[in-house]
Structures are given as structure tokens and as C-alpha cells.
From Swiss-Prot:
<comment type="function">
    <text>Component of the purine nucleotide cycle (PNC), which interconverts IMP and AMP to regulate the nucleotide levels in various tissues, and which contributes to glycolysis and ammoniagenesis. Catalyzes the first committed step in the biosynthesis of AMP from IMP.</text>
</comment>
<keyword id="KW-0658">Purine biosynthesis</keyword>
<protein>
    <recommendedName>
        <fullName>Adenylosuccinate synthetase isozyme 1</fullName>
        <ecNumber>6.3.4.4</ecNumber>
    </recommendedName>
</protein>
<dbReference type="InterPro" id="IPR033128">
    <property type="entry name" value="Adenylosuccin_syn_Lys_AS"/>
</dbReference>
<dbReference type="InterPro" id="IPR001114">
    <property type="entry name" value="Adenylosuccinate_synthetase"/>
</dbReference>
<dbReference type="GO" id="GO:0004019">
    <property type="term" value="F:adenylosuccinate synthase activity"/>
</dbReference>
<feature type="active site" description="Proton acceptor">
    <location>
        <position position="43"/>
    </location>
</feature>
<dbReference type="InterPro" id="IPR042109">
    <property type="entry name" value="Adenylosuccinate_synth_dom1"/>
</dbReference>
<keyword id="KW-0963">Cytoplasm</keyword>
<feature type="binding site">
    <location>
        <position position="70"/>
    </location>
    <ligand>
        <name>Mg(2+)</name>
    </ligand>
</feature>
<keyword id="KW-0460">Magnesium</keyword>
<dbReference type="GO" id="GO:0005525">
    <property type="term" value="F:GTP binding"/>
</dbReference>
<feature type="binding site">
    <location>
        <position position="43"/>
    </location>
    <ligand>
        <name>substrate</name>
    </ligand>
</feature>
<dbReference type="InterPro" id="IPR027417">
    <property type="entry name" value="P-loop_NTPase"/>
</dbReference>
<dbReference type="InterPro" id="IPR027509">
    <property type="entry name" value="AdSS_1_vert"/>
</dbReference>
<feature type="binding site">
    <location>
        <begin position="445"/>
        <end position="448"/>
    </location>
    <ligand>
        <name>GTP</name>
    </ligand>
</feature>
<dbReference type="InterPro" id="IPR018220">
    <property type="entry name" value="Adenylosuccin_syn_GTP-bd"/>
</dbReference>
Amino acid sequence: MSGTRASNDRPPSAGGVKRGRLQHEAATTGSRVTVVLGAQWGDEGKGKVVDLLATDADIISRCQGGNNAGHTVVVDGKEYDFHLLPSGIINTKAVSFIGNGVVVHLPGLFEEAEKNEKKGLKDWEKRLIISDRAHLVFDFHQAVDGLQEVQRQAQEGKNIGTTRKGIGPAYSSKAARAGLRVCDLLSDFDEFSARFRNLARQHQSMFPTLETDVEGQLKKLKGFAERIRPMVRDGVYFMYEALHGPPKKILVEGANAALLDIGFGTCPFVTSSNCTVGGVCTGLGIPPQNIGEVYGVVKAYTTRVGVGAFPTEQINETGDLLQSRGHEWGVTTGRKRRCGWLDLMILRYAHMINGFTALALTKLDILDTLDEVKVGVSYKLSGKRIPYFPANQEILQKVEVEYETLPGWKTDTTGARKWEDLPPQAQSYIRFVENHVGVAVKWVGVGKSRDSMIQLF
């Protein structure tokens, strides 16, 4: 082999691409996406913020999770519940995109769409694009999810409290490189069927009591394949075109929340995907320089579904009042949510990871009847204040919360539509949160409807 490099083998720096062009391309990163993320344990009201921003968006995307998420949106007095579909699907002028980081249960997708069609959702299938690289959730994944919870309860006396939607088992299949994707379903169905049978057998060998109708599921999946075929695109190319074509407003709807993140959440009581800002890049196939605004959504108090440490939880009349006034029941599971005071250690931790550019503070009106409002501002461990959020559950359960007590406003805020309409004590509460976290509050929620979000700047 000759030691002389052929002219077409030389690297770009040797003259294949002009340096000025490289510099220009580096400067032109394309459009930037706006990201909406949960800053607590979920159920913060992300769907409402997304719905607000989606009114003038061109593309609304989901980047992770599956139909374990639960977003409620109220439009014209109608309440829509979304689990897998981006809640921006209501916007008839926008495209909704399910990215490669999402795990898709096809029966659940169509069931959800049909339920919302009865409430007024129209022509959703014409506005939905699904990444060909998204992994699939199968019925046996959901069955295994339930079996694993039963095993945990029997062996450890407690379970994780999953939604039993098959999300964890589906992501496990993905991580084990055994999962099946949308592109597999739409290619050679015989090959897909063979891999599906093998995957089902693997799960049956691990869970001998697992009962699954393999051939029945394959028959249904073949039907679903034809229904979704018109919606499926190469997701990476779709996003690249969207970012580098004519300027577009692109919105990313995060599911779950920071403390449910598989890497940064309160393990093991977490979900199985990255629901922090890094999941946007890996779940859509976009580079970090295309991340623009990152909005953190935080409830004016704290809630959690299922088990796990909860430092500011109020197992008393205050907790009951928050649960009752806030109608704190899980959208996906119907389970009662645990309630407590706002925890700023959690919020600061979520900000460290996500770099929020602004916050949306929701459900302020739920605090309207309280004489005083407490806010958790720091943790102590063995009598010493700690500056970090503990990774270990046992340690988190032992922390002592230091509270600041603020005066309540004892005024109905549900009619407020601008900053000046809020009582001075409510304004002070909002400023207190801003000052302690170091991030400005852009929206304040005082009710269910779209117009009950007060925009501050």
C-alpha cells in the first residue's frame, strides 16, 4: 500500500472543506427547542404549561417514558387525559412527534386516542409522527411489570409502586439489546415474529407463571403495523430537518420528573428513563447546542405517588387538606398522592441538573385557605446542615427539614389573571421561591383552565 494519501482520502482540515465554511456551520446551529420538565416527583402540571406553549408551536415532542405518564389538559371546559400522546396534540396546527426515547404500547396509544376523540379530539393521526427507532412495549411487558411488583412485595415487604404499564420491562429489553422497535415491526414481519416469540419465551423462562397469548398478540400487532405505517418517519432526519430548515417553534414535553429520573431520582423508586434535560438529546437525536429554554414546572407544594422518602410530607390535617383541595389522585393509576410542603432542596437539586431558565409555579390556589405556609429550605443530617440532596434513600429518610414559615393570604386567587391581582402575601411566597432557587418564576397557576396561568414576563 502506498504511503501517499489519495486526494479524496484527505481529511477536511487538509483542504476538503474551507475553514470559513466550517466556522459558519458551527455558528449556525439551527432552531432551538423549548423544553418543559418536571422539577419534583411528577404531577406538577407540565401538561398545562405545554398546552399554553403549544398554541403557537410548530412541533410538540415526547422524548422519553411511555403511557406511564399522565398529563391533564382543560380546553373550553373539556378535560383531556394524555399518557403517551403529546398533550400538544390538541393543537390542530402543530405536528406531534414521539421520539426514539419513548417506549410505545400500540394498544394503549389507540385506546387513548379513541377516548379523547369522544371528548372532541379530531384528526390526531394526521398530525402524529412516530420515530422508527422507538422501542415497543408488549402486553407481556405489562404482565411482567405486575409480577415483579408482587415479587417485591413478597420478598421485601414493599414494592416500587410502578404504574404496571410495562415501562420498566420494556426499557430492560432495550438495555439488554433484545427489544423490538417500530422499524422492526414495519419491515419483515416474519423476522419480527420470530424475534417476538423469542423475547416472549425469555420472559416466560424468567417468570414461569407468566401467561401470554403470543400468536394472538402477533395478529393484533400486524394490524397495528398498518395503522401506524403512515405516521412513522426516520426520527433523526425528521428532527434535523425541523431544526435546520425554515425557523420553527419546537416544544419538548418531558414526562415524569427530576426525582423520578433513572440516574438522578430517588432510587429505586424511580421510572426507567432519563426525565432530566439529557434525555431530550438522547430521546430525540439532537445535539445539546439545540437546547434553548428549559422550563421547570413545580407545584406550590409537594406530592408523591407510591412509596419512598418524602422529607416534607405532612401526615396530618395539612396533608389531608392539600390532598383534598388539590384533588391529588394519579391520572394514570388513580392512586392517592402523598402531600407535603414545598421542598426547595429538591428544587435546587433539579435546577443543578437541568439548568432551568425559568419556572412555572402551579396550583398556588390550593394554598389559599391556609393561615400560614411553610417551605422546606434546607436539610440537616446528624445536626449538621448539608448542601446536597442525598442519593441514598435511608439517609434521605433521616434528614431533618429546616422550614421557613410565611404568612398565608386567606384569599381566593382563582380569579387572578395578572401579578397585581395576587395578594401581597402570595406575591411574597413566589419571590421567596425565586430568591432561594435563583431562577425566575415565569408563570403562576391558580386554576385548571388555560387562562388561569398568570404570565409574569
